[in-house]
Amino acid sequence: MKLTNVGSFDNIFDFVKHKIGIYQNREKTMETLFELMFSESENTMAEISDGYRIRKFSYGQIKSEISAAAPTLSEQLSDVPLGKMVGIYMSNSINWIKVLWCVIMCGYRPLLMNTSFSDAILEDILKKHDVGAVISDKKQFSVLTVLAEDALKPSDKKLDTREFGTEILFMSSGTTENVKLCAYNGENFFYQICDTYNIITQCPSIATHYKGELKQLALLPFYHVFGFIAVYLWFGFFSRTFVFLKDLNPATIQNTVKKHNVTHFFAVPSVFERVHKAVLSKVKAKDKKSYKKLCRALKISNSLGKANKAFAKSALKEVRENLFGDSICFLISGGGGIDTETLKFFNGIGYHLANGYGMTEIGITSFEKSASPKQLVKGSIGSQFGYTEYKVAEGDRLFVKGRTRASRIFMGDKIINTDYDEWFDTKDIVKVEKGRYYHCGRSDDLIVGANGENLNPVIIEPLLTVENSNGVCLIADESNSPVAIVSVQNCFSVTRLDGIFNAVERAITRANLDSVIKKVVITSESFMDAGEFKVSRKRVRRKYLSGELTTIERSRASEHIQTASVRLEQEIIDIIAEILERDASKVGATDHFFHDLGGTSLDYFMLLDAVRNKYSVEISEATSENLHSAREFYNFIRTTV
């Protein structure tokens, strides 16, 4: 199908080459980036669901609204000296994009604030780096705080002449003591964009359109370097469309992808892994025959190479239809290691899922560009992009250099200006096979065993992961002895807990690690805090050593289950109360959802959805006919999970 949204060209490749050529002949400033990013004024920049309608916003419309709002924001920040950092504390939205460019247009440097960080961490950063103000969609801070809706009010005035802000700053993940701010200027972004032409020529699939359009789901937070560069910058510069979500409910994501014909979405590994696990659980619950049939079809599909698309289109059509439909063209997982079985699942059903690599300090530097499922399922992060160099040294650690790196890094009271000729130590362990790089863990996560050998959690943890658990985290205790911590959430059975202890111990024996790993601990907590992209073993270890991590002793399993069961019933009551907008104290455990509490059919569907998502359970239509009170849901979950 001929594209009509690529300027005067009839294909995306010539359009990309042409636009990069224009950029190469211009100053590498944020002002140039803004002008070029919004130059295809008639192209659709964003789509949102408004009830049953889809609302569309063009690049020209959004550019006009940014220009109209900039004088308003300038007045509100009149006491903030030009050139200062101004924080943006917002979720992904069209308004986030407007605020970003308004801040830059007004002469300030946007600090993209991680909304999952605690107030203490954020306030410490604001104070430490003398941030002038924060634009927020809801939250108030100790510095001047301007609500986004006020900042974006159109003005009849014109913004007085001034230079655009010179850089955008990202927060690295971490604790109060070690959050770094990484600053990217116009030149850094230029080189990230220049990489895209080589990317699409080596990997044409990433430029695939569906029914003449390429639509990127705005799922990854734009405050994260992966979300900003790989989603917003790469696709926004070439005026592709962003689809925004009203919330992050799994059902909303699934429905939005189908409704808008989303073609691309990039996410952290846990998102893809949860989807994979949910699909398998659903098929298993249906019947064993269907599950075996699916596994067999996936194995065949992944063995076919490039021919797998035709096979998957026919044999696995129902799976895709029940998941995201047929519009999906390209997926990237980044931000951590991804389970091989998850790669096999997505590529096996006919979606293209590649593994990628980058860091807050270095930008996005590679992803697997092969079109072959046989290669994609190996989990390689590919080879480096054109403006980046890789080398492996000092214990298989990956070192990176190139002009796509952050121009400077703020660490506490120090500012480190980047020397682009120096190598940056990522501290990531990699192996190289035929020019492709494979991420094998972190050097600072290695545990030195009693025999002097290094234990790599990335290699060992999968060997110890057992059924009915939510993952394993291998850490060192205070004496540097390895401890296998097993996450088991929503468990209401002593038998299940005991079975997990036994299964992990057997797995340790199978891996010949009996003499090395002598302690197994179960926790009811997730290894990742809200908003985290990957497991921080340092944080898990710190919580374990300080006693902050909730652990379950084998001898006290019954006590834990009893406490968890009481909490479960109250959680369900709270869910019902929230859906019906009632005081939880007025909802009885045995109150009938319809007869006593006055719930509607729509309310009940919301309840089923909430319970499914929170407790990862499948509720069939037949089962739901017997679930009408908190107590009935409680009994169902206790016997199912």
Predicted regions and their residues:
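Conserved structural elements of the adenylate-forming
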Residues: 65-71, 182-209
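Conserved AMP-binding A3 loop
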Residues: 58-60, 167-195
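Conserved C-terminal "lid"/linker of ANL adenylate-forming enzymes
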Residues: 447, 505-562, 585, 608
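Conserved AMP-binding/adenylation subdomain of ANL enzymes
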Residues: 193-215, 222-309, 313, 317
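Conserved pre-ATP/AMP-binding loop-to-beta segment of ANL
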Residues: 42-44, 153-171, 177-178, 204-215
